[in-house]
Structures are given as structure tokens and as C-alpha cells.
């Protein structure tokens, strides 16, 4: 039976904490002026069982363009990464402070919104994938560069490298579950590739799948002669489904739910009313 948590003014982040019955969330203060809020850049924990609410991070300015806010991502084991307009890092949940990993040149949108680097953990929790703001191709300001890459930080080798170039600002990398049939702990990464990388703020995207190291990159949906996807995070099926050559990836395309086989690129339209806006696997 649904019940109210009493939590309000959440814009960028709320998610289950892995292995617990608690939710982590960040809040904003409503404002009459655009974009409609002032981010607190805080983090709280709420227990579904007891209703207890605990603070993890105090409110802060949030760095460059901190008024927009920040977002977070849990690894399968419960490590927490953060992203804000000027960088990414980890959250020390015991010490309750931020541990910066990498500075990112913030994007000057010349508007009342800010770009947040999207990020996701690899299925083994050893790699953090994120979208980074690439240097400009000419003499324009670094903050005005129209190019974005997908990079990865390995916590085993303590190294960061680019694995996909000029993807677009809304690439939204997403890692599959571990492939149990393999001797190695392998997984794939899906992301959105801008059709026109230098205009990725307003143009559409195609779904791409690659191995965890960026190799074997394949564009699988939609067809080259079809309109592209609106920005979204590709949603991997949590487990393999019999009869498919790869794992299913769910996307919203032209208002409908589609399932795309990551192995052969076969796509299946599930709904037809054009009313789907958000999706998730259960």
C-alpha cells in the first residue's frame, strides 16, 4: 500500500541504497524565478522501515553553477559517486564529505539551466563511466565547447581514459549486468550517440553498445534512415531472457516502449499509444 514519506522538493536525485530498505535523496529550495529552484546540494537517507531521516551531506554552494544542483550514482556494492557541473567524485558515507576525482570544465549554456555529467558504475563496481566536456576545436572558450566524450575511471589501476569520443552531452552511459556465462566478469555499456555531435543539445541520438573497454562498438537502434532518440538513459534488463542473443535494452522511442536485443540489434515495439514517458525494469 502506498504511503507518504513526507519528503518533498526533490529534483535531481532519489534512489534506493543497495542492500538496504532505505532511500538516499537530495533536495532543493523552490524559487519563483527560473529554473524554479535553488539546489541545496545536500544528501539525506530515509529508512522505509523506521521512518528515520539522517543527513549524509550538509547543504553547500555546489561549486560552479551549483544553483542547478548535483546528482549521484550507487555502485552495486553501495559506493556512491557524485556529479556536479564542474566535476565528479566519490561520497565518503562514513565521513560525510566529498572526495573529488576529476575536474570537468563546466558548460556555459547561456541560459537558465546547467549541464550535469551523467555517470554510471560498471557491473563489477570497479569502473565509473561518465560524460566529460571535451576541449573546443578552435579558439572558442573551453566552457563553450560543443563536444563531449565518454570516459572511464578504473579504481583497480587508478587511471582515467576516454573510451568514446564526441558522443554528445546527453550520452547517458548505462552498464549491463554481469554476464554469468563468461569465465571473466564481463559486461557491456550502452549509451546514446548524437547524430550531430556539435549540436547535441538540440539534436537526436542513436543507441550504441560497446564492451566495457570501449571496443566492439555497434550502433543498434534506430535505423539510420529513421528519426533518432530523445535523450534518456538506456535501461538494461536485469537478467538475460531466453531466446535472445544478448540482453534486452529498453528505450522510449516516439512515445512508445521498445526492447532492443543488444546482441543482434533486433528491436521489438511493445506499446503503440505514444504515451510512454518513463520506463524501468522490475
Question: Where do the model's predicted regions map?
Answer:
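Sequence signature of WD/YWTD-type beta-propeller architectures
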Residues: 1-282
Amino acid at each position: 500500500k502506498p504511503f507518504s514519506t513526507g519528503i518533498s522538493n526533490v529534483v535531481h536525485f532519489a534512489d534506493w541504497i543497495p542492500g538496504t530498505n532505505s532511500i538516499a535523496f537530495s533536495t532543493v529550495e523552490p524559487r519563483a524565478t527560473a529554473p524554479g529552484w535553488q539546489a541545496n546540494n545536500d544528501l539525506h537517507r530515509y529508512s522505509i522501515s523506521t521512518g528515520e531521516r539522517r543527513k549524509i551531506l550538509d547543504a553547500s554552494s555546489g561549486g560552479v553553477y551549483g544553483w542547478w544542483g548535483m546528482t549521484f550514482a550507487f555502485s552495486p556494492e553501495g559506493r556512491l559517486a557524485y556529479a556536479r557541473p564542474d566535476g565528479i567524485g566519490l561520497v565518503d558515507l562514513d565521513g560525510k564529505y566529498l572526495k573529488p576525482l576529476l575536474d570537468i570544465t563546466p558548460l556555459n549554456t547561456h541560459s537558465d539551466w546547467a549541464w550535469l555529467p551523467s555517470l554510471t558504475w560498471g557491473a563489477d563496481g570497479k569502473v565509473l563511466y561518465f560524460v566529460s566536456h571535451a576541449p573546443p576545436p578552435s579558439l572558442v572558450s573551453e566552457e563553450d565547447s560543443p563536444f563531449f566524450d565518454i570516459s572511464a575511471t578504473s579504481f583497480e589501476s587508478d587511471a582515467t581514459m576516454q573510451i568514446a569520443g564526441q558522443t554528445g552531452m546527453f550520452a547517458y552511459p548505462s552498464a549491463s549486468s554481469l554476464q554469468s556465462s563468461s569465465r571473466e566478469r564481463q559486461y557491456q555499456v550502452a549509451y546514446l550517440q548524437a547524430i550531430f555531435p556539435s549540436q547535441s543539445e538540440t539534436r537526436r541520438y542513436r543507441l550504441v553498445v560497446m564492451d566495457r573497454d570501449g571496443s566492439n562498438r555497434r550502433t543498434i537502434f534506430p535505423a539510420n534512415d529513421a528519426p533518432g532518440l530523445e535523450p534518456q538513459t538506456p535501461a538494461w534488463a536485469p537478467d538475460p531472457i531466453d531466446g535472445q542473443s544478448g540482453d534486452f535494452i529498453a528505450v522510449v522511442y516516439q512515445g512508445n516502449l521498445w526492447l532492443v536485443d543488444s546482441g543482434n540489434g533486433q528491436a521489438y515495439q511493445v506499446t503503440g499509444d505514444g504515451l510512454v514517458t518513463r520506463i524501468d525494469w522490475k
